[in-house]
From Swiss-Prot:
One of its GO terms (molecular function) is identical protein binding. The chain crosses the membrane at residues 7-27, 39-59, 69-89, 101-121, 132-152, 168-188, 192-212, 227-247, 252-272, 287-307. Its main location: membrane. It holds the Pfam family Mem_trans. Belongs to the auxin efflux carrier (TC 2.A.69.1) family. It comes from Oryza sativa subsp. japonica. Disulfide bonds: none annotated. Residues 28-38, 90-100, 153-167, 213-226, 273-286 are cytoplasmic. InterPro entries: Auxin_Efflux_Carrier (IPR051107), Mem_transp_PIN-like (IPR004776). PANTHER family: AUXIN EFFLUX CARRIER COMPONENT 1B-RELATED, AUXIN EFFLUX CARRIER COMPONENT 8. GO terms for biological process: auxin export across the plasma membrane; auxin polar transport; auxin-activated signaling pathway. This is Probable auxin efflux carrier component 8. (indol-3-yl)acetate binds at residues 51, 112, 114, 145, 267-268.
Length: 311
């Protein structure tokens, strides 16, 4: 059962992100500290340095020999269904075909597992949930962010990105390190940690700068906002639920998979969308509004799945 202490732990993890975003917003709206060109430079730093190093740190510190196979298969199936579905819809209905394929995939399958998910679901389902969500974070960083970057690069036709190599390096080191119990030299790990620890904070700072440069906070408009929230909080969990059930997941493991899919939008896809100028307004709105309703939505899914058990 979720306690007030568990909710406080979630707020403890998420409020600092909002502090970074609000400071960035005020630095543009009130203090006029940055020009649009400088804001673009900050976002490029986040995309090319902070996020790749954060991905390396997450992947290299997770044991690849202790993964839940059913969770991996269900995650792959969910993403595959989302890709195929949005590819078909985008081709049939949307003028910006590739843009909506990328945005729809990001909204439906890439939640904020690291910051919001782990503390919240540990309160709901215990330490087991934290361990499982760490594996999902690795899959996100290693496979799905790489695929997302590939889609962005395919759209831009501009070559490969630095994040791909950092994730591959992180996986190689994790395979070697956990197999033979080798640790990175402290001077190397501290150098990586210095930049990676600020990765999410800098991403939220970039989000605040982007929001401040828009004429209104809901930059994409009310209709697109509602569509984005519906994809994030309804379609994403539905796809994950169907995929997990089809793979054979039951009980607590199935519930964890569904609730983590109903978490608010991840920050990293926005950083990439801003860097490649692909519907960043939709993702920024999904993050801002989604973070505000994260706890109520997760609790709604949690209680909805325990009511049948009580009956």
């Amino acid at each position: 059962m979720v306690s007030w202490k568990d909710i406080y732990l979630v707020l403890e993890a998420t409020v600092p992100l909002y502090v970074a975003m609000i400071l960035a917003y005020l630095s543009i709206k009130w203090w006029k500290l940055f020009t649009p060109e400088q804001c673009s430079g900050i976002n490029k730093f986040v995309a090319k340095f902070s996020i790749p190093l954060l991905s390396f740190q997450v992947i290299s510190t997770t044991d690849p020999y202790d993964m839940n196979i059913k969770l991996i298969y269900s995650d792959i199936l969910q993403k595959s269904l989302a890709l195929l579905g949005f590819a078909a819809i985008s081709k049939a209905c949307c003028a910006e075909k590739f843009d909506w394929l990328i945005t729809g995939f990001s909204l439906s399958t890439l939640p904020n597992t690291l910051i919001v998910g782990i503390p919240l679901l540990k309160g709901m389902y215990g330490e087991q949930a934290g361990k499982l969500l760490s594996q999902i974070v690795v899959l996100q960083s290693l496979i799905w962010y790489t695929l997302l970057l590939f889609l962005f690069e395919l759209r831009a036709a501009n070559g490969m990105a630095t994040t791909t190599s950092s994730e591959t390096t992180g996986l190689i080191w994790a395979l070697v390190g956990f197999r033979w119990h080798i640790r990175l030299p402290l001077i190397v790990s501290n150098s990586i940690r210095m930049l990676s620890d600020g990765g999410l904070g800098m991403a939220m700072f970039s989000l605040g700068l982007f929001t401040a440069l828009q004429t209104k906070i809901i930059a994409c408009g009310a209709k697109r906002m509602l569509l984005a929230l519906a994809i994030r909080f309804f379609l994403g969990p539905a796809l994950m639920g169907m995929s997990s059930y089809a793979i054979g997941m039951r009980g607590v493991l199935l519930k964890i998979a569904i609730v983590q899919a109903a978490l608010p939008q991840g920050i990293v896809p926005f950083v990439f969308a801003k860097e490649y100028n692909v519907q960043a307004d939709i993702l920024s709105t999904a993050i801002i509004v989604g973070m505000m309703v994260a706890v109520p939505v997760a609790l709604a899914y949690y209680f909805a799945m325990i009511i049948p058990a009580i009956k």
